[in-house]
Structure formats: C-alpha cells, structure tokens
Amino acid sequence: MGYSYTEKKRIRKDFGKRPQVLNVPYLLTIQLDSFEKFIQRDPEGQQGLEAAFRSVFPIVSNNGSTELQYVSYKLGEPVFDVRECQIRGTTFAAPLRVNLRLVSYDRDAAPGTIKDIKEQDVYMGEIPLMTDNGTFVINGTERVIVSQLHRSPGVFFDSDKGKTHSSGKVLYNARIIPYRGSWLDFEFDPKDNLFARIDRRRKLPATIILRALGYSTEEILDLFFEKIQFEIQDNKLLMALVPERLRGETASFDIEANGKVYVERGRRITARHIRTLEKDNVTKIDVPTEYIVGKVSAKDYIDLESGELVCPANMEISLDILAKLAQAGYKSIETLFTNDLDFGPYISETLRVDPSSDRLSALVEIYRMMRPGEPPTKEAAEALFDNLFFSAERYDLSAVGRMKFNRSLGLAEGVGNGVLSKEDIVGVMKKLIDIRNGRGEVDDIDHLGNRRIRSVGEMAENQFRIGLVRVERAVKERLSLGDLDAVTPQDLINAKPVSAAVKEFFGSSQLSQFMDQNNPLSEVTHKRRISALGPGGLTRERAGFEVRDVHPTHYGRVCPIETPEGPNIGLINSLSVYARTNNYGFLETPYRKVVDGQVTEEIEYLSAIEEGNYVIAQANASLDEDFRFTDAFVTCRGEHGESGLYRPEEIQYMDVSPQQVVSVAAALIPFLEHDDANRALMGANMQRQAVPTLRADKPLVGTGMEKPIALDSGVAVVAKRGGIIQYVDASRIVVKVNEDETIPGEAGIDIYNLIKYTRSNQNTCINQIPCVNLGEPIGRGEVLADGPSTDLGELALGQNIRVAFMPWNGYNFEDSMLVSERVVQQDRFTTIHIQELSCVARDTKLGAEEITADIPNVGETALSKLDESGIVYVGAEVKGGDILVGKVTPKGETQLTPEEKLLRAIFGEKASDVKDSSLRVPNSVSGTVIDVQVFTRDGVEKDKRALEIEEMQLKEAKKDIAEELEILEAGLFSRVRNLLIDGGVDAKELDRLDRTKWLEQTLNDEAKQNQLEQLAEQYEELRKDFEHKLEVKRGKIIQGDDLAPGVLKVVKVYLAVKRRIQPGDKMAGRHGNKGVISKINPVEDMPYDENGQPVEIVLNPLGVPSRMNIGQILETHLGLAAKGIGEQINRMLKEKQEIEKLRGYIQKAYDLGGGSQKVDLNTFTDEEVMRLAQNLRKGMPLATPVFDGAEEKEIKDLLELGGLPTSGQITLYDGRTGEKFERPVTVGYMYMLKLNHLVDDKMHARSTGSYSLVTQQPLGGKAQFGGQRFGEMEVWALEAYGAAYTLQEMLTVKSDDVNGRTKMYKNIVSGTHQMDPGTPESFNVIMKEIRSLGINIDLDEE
C-alpha cells in the first residue's frame, strides 16, 4: 500500500495475518446519527422533532370550531460557539421557532367552511445541540447521553420456570409491550385457567377481554377449539372420526367399523392403529351413549318450539340433556375436542370462572378493575376500554413493535398499524395456548433480538413529545374559553413546559452523564456505552444473573469483556468495534458473504434476529488464494449460536475481523488472547483512567487500534482538506489548500486554532501541540496537532518502561512496584492537573458583597499576590490557605460598647461591619495561577481587572481576525497575481503597484477578466466579513454576562498543579496488572544489565501465575525486541553507516514474520528513510492485533534481529553490591499507565473539624474534613490487648463526649495533661431511641 508523507514518518509494523477487509467505522456514529435524525427535516415525519409535532398537532377545540395546525419548524443559529459556552457556563443550544396556523371554522355555514386563518412563528424554547464530537455542553460542562438497551416493544412469551407455585408447575404467560400505552398480560394460573392483567393490576379471566371485544361464548369457543360431530340415529350415537385425535388414548370401547374391530377395548391406541384407520378410510364409528357424557357443547341448543335453551354453549352434556336434545329434534351435536396431552380445555374452563355474560358486563368489570370506587356508566366503560388499546393517541406499538409482533405471530410484515386489533389479541392468546399445549417455545428475554438500543435522538424526541402534550392540554383549555378573534398562536402557546422537559432530560436524566474526560479513550468509550439502567430500564437491585450474563447474540455487537466491576456488572456494556444500530434500533454486526464455499468481497450487516438462521465461520478460518476454505470441516456458529463443524459449502457468512467481538478499549490490549477474562476486564477499564502524561509516548507494543481511536476521539486536530503547511506556531496552523480541493473563487486557506492548557471534566489538562513542520505536504484527514495522550496521531496513554520481573527486598510485595528515580527525573509520569475555583459575589439582605483588596484583619503578606481589584495575578504561585480573590460580606450591625463608639468617633473607622469571605486555596492544594475570568452582571460596573481582561481579549480577537484576513488576502492576491501574469501583465510592473490596484487591471481574455472580477468581489466580501466578524466578537466580549439570580459577579481562577510520580500513586499495565508504588529507589541501587543499563521498574513475578494474564510477559518480550531493533538503528545512525545498509536492516525488520502488511522501503527516498530511522531510534512500534497477533516464533526472530537473547531473559546485577543475581531475569519494555488515583488527592489528616449533629461524632471522608473511623473490629482489638485506657479515650473524648473533649482541649492548651471522660453522646441517642419505643430508661447516678 502507498503511504502518505505523514504516514511515512513512523510506520507501525503489523503482525496481523489477515488483511483488513473492512476499516474500523467512525466510532461516534451511534451518537451523531441519532441526533441528526432528531433535528433533521424529515418529510415523512417518521422520526425526530417533525414526528413529535405531527403526533400532537393539530389541536382541536372541544367544540371543533377552531384548530391549531402545525406547518413547519426551523432551528436558528446558536448565539455562542462551543468554546464560549464552556467558558461562560451556558448551554450550547439553538432557538426553535415553529410555524403554526390557527384556523377558525364558520359554525353557521357548511361543515369545513373556514372563517379565519392566522399564521405565525412561535418561539418554542431552545434545543441543546450536539458538538462535532457527540457531546452536549449543558451549563458549561460537557455531558454525554448514554444509549439505553431496553426491552423492544412487541409481544413476548415467557414462563415462570416453575418458581411461582409450590408444586413446581410451569406457568406460561404472554405480554404485549407497546412503545407507549398500557401493557396487556395473559397468564395461566396453577389450575390452568387463563387470566389477563392490564398494566400489572388485578387479574381478570382472559375471556372478559374477548367478551369486551364483542365475542359471544359460541364465537369464543369457535376461535379456540376443534369440534367433534356426534349424530343421533335410532338411539345410537355416531361419531365423526379424525383418527389422528385418538393418538395415545386408551379405547374405552371396541372401535369397529364395517364389521371389523380396529382397536379392542382397554388397548392403548398407537400410530399403527391410526394408520390402519386412515388406510381403510374410516370416517364414522359407533360410540356408546355414555361416551358423550362429560363432553362440552360447542354452541347453544334451543328448543325451537318452546324457545327454551336446552343446552347452552360450554355446558357439559349429561344423558338427561342428550335425551332433551333428541326430543327437541336435533340430529347432530357439536362438542369441543380436548385432551390432556396437546389440546387442553383452558378457555372452556376459564369461561366457567368468568363472571360476565355479555359485552356490557365485561366492560363494567374492566372499568371496576381500572378505576376502583368509581360508579361505571356504559359510555365511560366503553370509552375507557377503547382508549386502552385502540386509540392512536394513547397507544402506540411503534414500527418496531409492530414488526416484532407480526414476526412473533407469523403474520406478514406490513399487516396492522400502531394500535391493537381484535385479531391481534386473539392471535396472542392462541399462541400462548399453543405453547401451553407443547407446540412452540417461550422467548429468550436476553436475546439481542428482543432488546433494542434507544439513543439520544429518540430519548430527546420522547421528552419533547411529553412537553408538547403538556402544552396541548393548556391550548385545548384556552381554545374552549371562546373569544378567539383577537388571539394569535403566540398567545395560545406557552413554551415553558417544552423547554422545561428538554432541559430536565439533558440536565438531570440518569442517562445524561458528566463526560468522562480523563483521556481520549475514556471519551470514546463513554459515547459508545450502552446502559440497561435508566428510565424505562432495569434497576440494579432487580436485575438478576441472566440479564447481566454474556449471551451468544452479544457476539460482534456488545463486548463480552468491558463492563464495570461492582453492582453494575453486566448492566452497563460497551459497543463492539464494528457494531451499529439498524433502523429499528437493533444492533447489527458485519459479515462477509460466502457463496458456494468461496468468501466474497460483499459485506452484509446482520441483526441478532437474522443471524440465528445462518451458518457463520470465524474470521480465523484458513482460506486459500481464491478465498476458499482449505479445511474439509470448519468450526462455525450454526443455528441458535451453537458452535459445530460444517462443510465449506454449508457456510453462508464469515466474520469480518478477529477483533469484531470486542470493544474499542479491549481491542487496545495486545495479546488479549493470552489474558484471563477477569484481568482483561480490569485492563480495559483501567486504560480509561490513565492520566495524560506531560510528554505522550506511543506504545512500542500496540494493536493497530491506536490510530482510529485518536482520530475519532476529536482531541487531535485533523486536516479538513489537503495542502501545504504555510504557517505553524504553538497556537495556530495555517494550511494552503491544494488547488483541486478548493471551490472556485475562494482564498483556499484553512486556519486551525489550537486549544491551549484548558481544563477537562476530570481536572486533567487539555493541550494541543502541532506535529507538522513548515512546508510539509499533508493530506485530508491527517493529523496536524496532537491532543492530550496522542503521539503523531496515535493514542498514547502511558509510557514505555524498562521492567524486570524479580523480587527486590519485599518492596514489590502484594503487587506494589519499585520505581527508579530516573523515571521521576525524566518526568516520565509527570502530569498537569488544572483546577477551577470560583468566587461568587451576591446581593445579600444586608447589602451587596464586594470583591476588593481591602479586607479587614488581614496582613500585607496575605494580600501580596492580589492586584488592586482584589484578584490574584496570573502566574502567582499559591499554596493552601492563600487568598485568591478578596471578598467582604456585610454583617448585621452589632451593639457597640461606649469605648468602641469613642474610638469610632475619633478615628472614623467603619471597617468592622464587614466580614472576610475571601476565596482561599484549599488546604491540600498548591499550584500556579494560569488564568482568571471575571463575569459581571449587566448593569453592574466592571472593575479594573475585568476591563483589563476585556481589553486583552479584544486585542487578541482583533489580532486573530487580522492575521486570518492577512493570510486569506495573501492567498487571494497570489491567485490574482498568477491570473494577471497569465493574462500578459508584466510581473515587475505588478510588484511596483499597490496590491489593491491589481484588482483594477483589465485583461483582454474575457474568461480571465471574469475570474478577476470574481476575485475582486471576493476581496470585498472578505473585508466586509472581517468587519462583521470583529463587530460580533466585540459585542460578545463587551456585553454583560447572564448570571444566576442574585449574583453580581463571578470570578473564576484556574490553578495548574504539576504532579510528579510518588509512593502511593497507582499504576497499571494494560493487562489488569495494577499496583501501588512502594518506593522510589536511587538509580544506582536498581538492578542493571551487563551494559550497565538499569531497569526502571521492578515488578513482582508472583503477580502473574495466579492472575493468568500472561499477555504482560509476551508484551514485555516483544517490547524488548522492539527496543533492541531501535537500538540497532540508533547505532547505525551514530556510526553514520551508508543509507542502503540502514534501509536494508529496517526492511528486514518490517519483512519479518507472517504479517499481511507489506512495507516496501524501495519506494521511499533517502530523506524519507532517514526521517523514518530517526523516529525508530527509540524503538520500532509494533502492532499485534487482538486474536491475530504475534506468535512465539516471530517474537524470538525479532529478538534475534535486535541482537538479544531469544529467551527474553537477561543476567542482572544488584545495584547495591554489584553481585550477579543467581539466575537470568525477564527484562523488557512494558507500557505502563499512571491512573487517576493519586495519593495527593487521597492523603488527609484531621485536626479540629465538624461533627455530626445527632451523634456528635466527627464526620467521615476527605471532603468533609472527616476523622478516621475506629470501628467495631478495632474496638475488639483494643479489648483483646486489654488496653482499657486507650479504649476509653477512643470512645469518649476522641469521639462524641462533648463536654469531655472541650475540657480536654482546654487542658492541653493550659498545659495540664489530664482527662476526665463523661458520657458519650451516642449513649444518650440510644436512650432516647429506647424511650421512643415507650420504655422509660434512666441513669442512676450513684
């Protein structure tokens, strides 16, 4: 493959044996597409805002004389861009305007005659917009809406697995779940009667529902049963025979016909008997009259003469009734066919317990159940039942629900709509009875064909609809008040409910989460997360094992590895690398189509429902050159996800890639296939907690997924169009766009402004650093600047560290690590953390708070870092307790003593009526002030500092826009110059003229003259655009800020803290091998090899065998080989060996092993080879893709090429004694991460602090400045030691003996060290609790 200029800088050697068939898709599609569907203009109105509006409008008044119709909507432009919203703490949103039409009809004229139409645009609140990276900025913080995995609408058949009833009998049930509306359940009870529930309420016999639908008893029996015909002839009974129905029964009489006995009495009827009966075509047999006794009549039999009901439907027939029927002249009788095996009499039995007899009584029963205590009327009962399942406003199955419903009942795809029909309900009951009879099986709730993804767009649409429904009620009320002549749509609509519903969803829904912004990976995974919790989902407590477990249908859709440890395990999942959602919201995964044993190029996405019908081969099945399977039998997944061996011609699909099973985070773990799943889970989760280091370092051993993640996360700057770097500095990159990518007549310049040292949600530092140089060519989609944790466009979460697996004086006991001082000196794991501290000046009852440097009772030194406005200056180094912003609050007037009054009269001192409420640096924090922002309310005078900041911002904005204009103008004029020179104007002549005069030249060639005029117009546009931009920017900077009620001023101070690595910090590898640093050892004491090179971290070898994460050992070996090759290249460069030798060696390294990637260095120029070699000096980056990685032989060959022992083990010497260790040690390079669990954030000690109100015990936790808990077990320990006095002070003066501890404090202050303990407060609490139970308890003080 050809490499671009940027890609040639550093090529990662790939060990993957299988060529990539499908590139990794854009990783944030699930978020962006969903929101796009929400705000797009959908002409069909099937989804998004359009669908919400169409479902609620038109709103018709109760008398039908007026209606409010929806015409269209449009979203305006947001006022501030994303960055400004984050700084100002506002929401990034666009105003929504809806065009509505109020139509009033003339009631006196013919129906439909229009009297008046008013059309108007109505403001409907603001809709938060998604940023380019799939997040929302709500009140200045970035949030992510996590997708939800919920039960798909449709019908589900299930059983209780014998757990409900003590007998262990399996009870089946069916549940119709709509997208919105009431649930309808059908269930069997232990007596085999069928019941129905609406909305999980009290159960009713299911036949009540059927009666309410208008079915009579006869019709009900007709729907659910087959019939047996009996004929009465000469006091004999003839039965119409269907031989199949006799299977398995015992004959209670001789079955004979045509004089031949087929089955003797008492014999069991077998399949052979049935075949003989069918062969002889026996259709009727004589039966004794007793045979009909106990059978159930299938319809009403009425004596036609007297009109008397002889035998109602569903009545058991006795000999008396048989005689009456014969007497009434009936020649044939129909009864229900039932048996115990596969035709149960369930509906017939249920009809017997059904209290209703006709439609009305059934409707009344339903009404009583839904609205207990209300007197039913016929209309109310009918309306209620109608609204439950048959009104489109109250009930909607949705397209998904209808599709699932029809599939389940075996109906055609297009049948039916969003509401239920009679046939639907009967169909569900029939299928449920079939399942009870042993035909068909229950659904698997955890199958991904029964669970679907609800993404941002859909959830926002639902919230929006809820808001609109609230508005609808208010509008209906207003319309029915009459007097509508002067009313416009704007008067009718109050947008508050809509914007409130939307705001609530984005701001405080369980699924709207504060974005995890530790590093680019954590951002990407957060956006790809799938939660089963949240509104309409499961709750942690109720979720059982089955829901959390890995299901075969997860394959390629949901990652089996990445899920949190703890109570949410299995409820929060991550999308697999290639997975996507289809139109119905079901997860699909791609497969290569296989035709006649040959794998084609065609790729198809299958959902879990479709996948069950195919035979699918794995990605690692071996293929020949023609993409045919080489093995006679291939391991595949067949029906229902069971794996087995199949012949090549039976295979229909094949996996796309070996890594399609896992998620993005798990795909970053090299040698994942050699790790135990539990450790892999920890590894995937801990990579998300890695803090971006000061200097990002690409992993030597990667998986090839590093690039796509870094690009898709949006932290790096990516070129929109190809071109040449025209200008680059730390904060801006300018690209001159290639001619073929520019639009005719534009300047062809792209300007990229970089983000410098801003704070992330997790207080880590976001900073972009250019990685291109002046004059370099770049292509579209290539990286121009690295963000946090990216290195040349690759994800770089940690550092490559030289590790040794060996014990070292117990310093690596229990997973702790011994770290060399060199790691600290080289700032390998130094990180920058940025904290935001804010000070708010409010308007209080006693007067306004003031931000000032004039603070009472504070010495000069404390104010030394503040300017005259009382705000700390940028660049000040501050530590715990320092004042950042001086603020005074008025306090109430106090009674003054005569002396004070006198002093005040003499000195006129008025300062004592304010108290100091300044913003100080928290105790455990120290750092440098890197930025200050001042926000002032409209109408409040700005202080000097605010004006300075404003001035600076204006200056910068002007400079930015002027430079931008300068660059664009230069680009434009260079094109003008070329055009003029082409048109025959002399170049020297041109250079003498002023540039603006160039545009006034005339050319003979008409086409060129037109082009020149176009360029002149553009120049004018540019100037106007510049003025406009400047004006807008100026307006934004100068205008007052929109602050919360009662707030006059907000000052935000940003502190940067540099954290070096130190004992107590948590570090981890990528294989779940985590540990805490126990000691930082001097370099000279660390073990070293024969070349005198010391190791940087010593790890405990005992951490490997029991954890079974062997991946870390393989990574260490491969890392050593990568470094070895780097060192060989470095040596060749130092010795200035000829380029061909260098080229040959690098080529040899790339060619080693059986990887499918081929790098041909002969196509590289010498300069490119040199640049590549320079980038490979520190080690050759390798990629070992998940499940398709490097093999043992390849690792050995690579070690050999690097001039290293193939065992991967080296003889080490003790740094303290210089003695050789007695056996070789595994040494190599492992990629280590520093996790966001820093000892600085956890260290805490309490002096005197706050106490809990009730128990009077100190609070707990660092945030509350709490104490250390001395719990039950610690008390036992002291008891065991018999340390009575220590125990006494622990339980009294050091805890909750209020008087005792005050006395103790006084004693310590006065220097008398004695203690007199009293009663602990907790004793008083228990006494009061006992009293509250009505038992009086008193202390006898002796």
UniProtKB/Swiss-Prot annotation:
Instruction: State a single Pfam family of this protein.
Output: RNA_pol_Rpb2_1
Segments forming a coiled coil: none
Q: Which GO terms describe its cellular component?
A: DNA-directed RNA polymerase complex
Which UniProt keywords are given for this protein, alphabetically ordered?
A: DNA-directed RNA polymerase, Nucleotidyltransferase, Transcription, Transferase
Origin: domain of life = Bacteria
Q: What catalytic activity does the UniProt entry give for this protein? A: RNA(n) + a ribonucleoside 5'-triphosphate = RNA(n+1) + diphosphate
Which SUPFAM superfamilies is this protein grouped with?
Answer: beta and beta-prime subunits of DNA dependent RNA-polymerase
Q: Which InterPro entries match?
A: DNA-dir_RNA_pol_bsu_ext_1_sf, DNA-dir_RNA_pol_bsu_external_1, DNA-dir_RNA_pol_su2, DNA-dir_RNAP_su2_dom, DNA-dir_RNAP_su2_hyb_sf, RNA_pol_bsu_bac, RNA_pol_bsu_CS, RNA_pol_bsu_protrusion
Reply yes or no: does the keyword Nucleotidyltransferase apply.
yes
**Gene3D superfamilies with a match to the protein in the record:** 2.40.50.100, 2.40.50.150, 3.90.1100.10, DNA-directed RNA polymerase, beta subunit, external 1 domain (2.30.150.10), DNA-directed RNA polymerase, subunit 2, domain 6 (2.40.270.10), RNA polymerase alpha subunit dimerisation domain (3.90.1800.10), RNA polymerase Rpb2, domain 2 (3.90.1110.10)
Query: Which E.C. number(s) belong to this protein?
Result: 2.7.7.6
GO terms assigned for molecular function:
DNA binding; DNA-directed RNA polymerase activity; ribonucleoside binding
Please give the CDD domains that the UniProt record associates with this protein.
RNA_pol_B_RPB2
NCBIfam families recorded: PRK00405.1 (NF001616), rpoB (TIGR02013)
HAMAP family, sorted: RNApol_bact_RpoB (MF_01321)
Query: Subunit details for this protein?
Result: The RNAP catalytic core consists of 2 alpha, 1 beta, 1 beta' and 1 omega subunit. When a sigma factor is associated with the core the holoenzyme is formed, which can initiate transcription.
Protein purpose: DNA-dependent RNA polymerase catalyzes the transcription of DNA into RNA using the four ribonucleoside triphosphates as substrates.
Q: Which PANTHER family match?
A: DNA-DIRECTED RNA POLYMERASE I SUBUNIT 2
Q: What is this protein called?
A: DNA-directed RNA polymerase subunit beta
Q: Which organism is it from?
A: Mannheimia succiniciproducens (strain KCTC 0769BP / MBEL55E)
